[in-house]
Amino acid sequence: MPQRSPAQSVPALRPLPRNNRTESYLESLQILERLHRLMLDLVKDEFERLGRSDLTPVQAMLIYNLGTAEVTAGELRSRGMYQGSNVSYNLKKLVELGYVHHERCDMDRRSVRVRLTQQGQEVRDCVAELFCRHAEGLELSGVLDDPPVEAVNLQWRRVERFWAEQIRYIY
């Protein structure tokens, strides 16, 4: 079989048909990704300001989302408390650092339940205070009014539901 040049081995991609709605949706996806990264940067900056360098922003968000719940590692993902792929690693680190307590379930010894320690609650409170300050600033500036943030959240929940249905359909 003759060798192909790199240009021949990859079929040319034809442009997808796009309309204004598609373009707006794609822009929303880019904004959403940037917002997530900026949120992590804000958490990182807050912890640097407080002189706390032991946690990554992802770990701080895991602590924040865990809150007062006591769940298994699997439930962290299924309940939307953690979106990453390395939940076991981050939980292990948080246990080692003293932010999360873990214990085996009585009913199923393979399963581990996790909850925040007092030190973890303090981190959660730090992140909550940061987000409250941001919400107050956004409220005062009027950013949350047009369109109302509640309507924006409703729209994002609809997108979330659509995506979840797409994933269920695949499997």
Task: Give residue ranges: language-model regions.
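N-terminal leader segment of winged-helix/HTH proteins
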Residues: 1-53
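C-terminal regulatory/oligomerization modules of transcriptional regulators
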Residues: 1-22, 144-171
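Charged, amphipathic alpha-helical coiled-coil/dimerization segments
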Residues: 14, 92-151
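N-terminal positioning helix adjacent to the helix-turn-helix/winged-helix DNA-binding module
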Residues: 24, 57-58, 119
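Alpha-helical linker/hinge and terminal dimerization helices associated
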Residues: 35, 39-42, 46, 80, ...
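N-terminal helix-turn-helix DNA-binding core of bacterial DNA-binding proteins
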Residues: 42-86
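Basic amphipathic alpha-helical segments that dock to polyanions
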Residues: 63, 76, 91-97
